[in-house]
Amino acid sequence: MKKLYFLLFAPILSFSAQIEGTWKLAPQAAALGVGPGLGNTSWWSNSAGDVTTRACLFDDSIKFEANGNMTHYMNGSTWLEAWQGAPEGCGAPIAPHVGGAATYAYDATAGTLTVNGLGAHIGLAKVINGAEISSPAAAASSITYNVAISNGGNTLTADINFGPGWWRFVYQRTVPLA
């Protein structure tokens, strides 16, 4: 009976563990992209050169812990845009999108990741459910992404509908699974 119990519940445990760990945007072209439909990044996607230009964004990491806590590490700088009241480029994070502690809920069956906490996000801070915000004051306290984990558990693809289209963010583990 113990063996059967383990076999029934082992897959459930592995689903929740899929997202645990530390992730960074994949240092490649199209790690960030936007387009008219899910998975379509025809409106814009980052180039390989943007990985260097936006190095302050690509070095940010997000750690998901087993207890539902997450930490967004921005290392003192991230990519800023005009909607934040700053010139486009690398600079000190602007509140409330300053990283730090938040919580998350991952549902492997539904393929969703919800991050909770004012300003908590993955990808770009301006992208929330149903909109791109135009001021830091409009930050959301909860954002839900459609997520898929692939490449042996080492790639996380997050999609979010912002109204007129979809953003896509591709992350990779900082320490790959064996």
What are these regions (language model features)?
Residues S14-K24, V175-A178:
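N-terminal helix-cap/turn-to-beta initiation motif at the start of protein domains
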Residues Q28-V34, D50-G152:
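Contiguous, well-ordered beta-strand patches that form the walls/edges
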Residues L156-G165:
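Short, exposed beta-strand-loop hairpins at the edges of beta-sheets
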Residues A82-G85, G165-P176:
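C-terminal/domain-terminus segments
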Residues G33-A48:
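Short, polar loop/linker segments at the starts of domains and inter-domain junctions
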Residues M1-E20:
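Bacterial Sec-dependent N-terminal signal peptides
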